[in-house]
Amino acid sequence: MKVLFDTNVWLDIILSRGGFWEASLTALYDCIDEDDDLCVIATSLKDVFFLVERLKDANVAYESVERMLELARPIAVDEAVCRRALPLERPDYEDGIIEAAAEIEQIECIVTRDDDAFRDLGIRRMSPLEFIKERGTEVVAL
């Protein structure tokens, strides 16, 4: 399955955000175990770097992006994606970019905690908890 993790899910995992990171990490483990085509929008890499550097430090930020690149295939944000995103997800152009890239890349599921994003998209969207429950996986208790 082609699965795209939204930026907030990556941040849950990397920053161990309370109340969210266990389900997000379990979803990641499940994608790895199932040999899914796990994807990340290229802009998420820079967003994660920026936030992790700010909250932790540059070394942790670089390690985080490197690990993301080991686990997920980056999806390019090119002119076609940028133009396609203009009418989508208003007023949030950033979500429009993710939506446009997901459509072009034929992503089957977007895993996100953003309840308002991607509602009108023809691609399934699920929270990390919904994703693992649907796949019959238990939340990893850490």
Q: Which role fits each region the language model picked out?
A:
Residues 1-40, 53-60, 120, 129, ...:
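Short, well-structured N-terminal submotif of metal-dependent ribonuclease cores
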Residues 2, 71, 100-142:
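Acidic, PIN/NYN-like endoribonuclease modules and their adjacent C-terminal/linker elements
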Residues 34-35, 71, 88, 121:
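Structured helix-beta-strand junction loops
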Residues 41-49, 53-69:
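Glycine/small-residue-rich phosphate/adenosyl-binding loop
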